[in-house]
Amino acid sequence: MDTIGLDLHKRESQLCILTEDGEVIERRLVTSRERFTAVLGGRPRARILLEASTESEWVARHLEALGHEVRSCGAELK
């Protein structure tokens, strides 16, 4: 299963995918349902980690509807 880190912002977000094969894919994308569907909708089920923010609730629900496993965390990891 791929692991995806998603740094959400109001207009544009950063995406980092670590594939099962160890490949790292980094992208910037507009923060919208349409772009998340276009970029992540066709990918196999992945584990996605989101930083908790004002955008994270609707994004998490949308990504779960696309079939992904979504976790949200605070900005500070200890």
Pin down the residues of each PLM region:
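Phosphate- and other anionic-substrate recognition elements at nucleic-acid/protein interfaces
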Residues: 1-78
